């Protein structure tokens, strides 16, 4: 609960401001990460070098996200064919362990994500897929509410609600308030994907009808709603089924199947949930692939087809170590972290905060785009206006807070 409080605070004072900055650069330039900075920067400056950081961040994100996205497809198939029918909590946990222990299974579903993702981008049907995904996301939002209500009604769920929503400051002090705050800051950056140009690519297609402050609030509010509702599904269910809340990413693959199994028509609800999650994760895959493709086309002058043919094997081969890190290479440690944890650290602990600092300085510094031009772009359109008096916070406090995240993550 203390983490959640910090998370909400940092979304407000860090997340929304940086989102407006990335959106502003994208909408004003109508370009990809590197070309966007090159279009807006003062002549002769090197802000556009940040595009290489964005390119690296997108690549590293994809070489582990495609593996996790493959888990979604795998679980959809397992629910669809009835593999979970009649399972108890221990067997559900064993199913997840068996999945990650099988390198061929992980590589197959990862490869399926990579192949289909690049095929969609190569065929130019990403926008058509986006329309389908929007409908699926509305369905997912409705299903999340249903699952949250169901979790809250489970016997023994009250302890999970207390753990999630009632702050335990003594426990937070034991863990270190600074550590909790830094983790919440990292989570705010990661959930919004700010700092590596993803929002900039999205904004390059945006109209100028609405102010970017309002757009940033709406994006953050929707993201926060999903995150909070996910907590209301998972933590009460953890309490009800005796699953430790500290199990991390596997929670969705251990706790939720238990919820579905104990629901009427559980196979249907489980299949529906994981097909929605598959579309959600796959939309992220195609969006980041589009970012990679767009950057390479702009930077190297390649055609779309050539770019896809070059990137596909690089992403596929680059993703194999993450898949093997759960089994064949499970003993491999890099600075005390497993392969997935190290790749996640590079993105959420290093590239995202570093990129966010660059966006912040570019938008407020007279040696970059400048605060006045940034503010003019943010306030273009109807909706919430960004006040000029906020400039000192954006110029001095915001970069220092982001720097704290970066330094804390490296310690």
Q: Where do the language-model regions lie?
A:
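Helix-loop-helix connectors at the membrane interface of multi-pass transporters/channels
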Residues: 35-36, 69-101, 204-209, 214-226, ...
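Inter-helical loop and helix-membrane interface segments of multi-pass membrane transporters/permeases
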Residues: 31-53, 66-126, 155-182, 247-253, ...
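Juxtamembrane transmembrane-helix boundary signature
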Residues: 6-42, 66, 237, 241-244, ...
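C-terminal membrane-solvent junction of multi-pass transporters and transport-like membrane proteins
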Residues: 50-55, 292, 299-312, 344-402
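Membrane-water interface regions at transmembrane-helix termini and the short interhelical loops
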Residues: 46-62, 97-99, 112-136, 201-209, ...
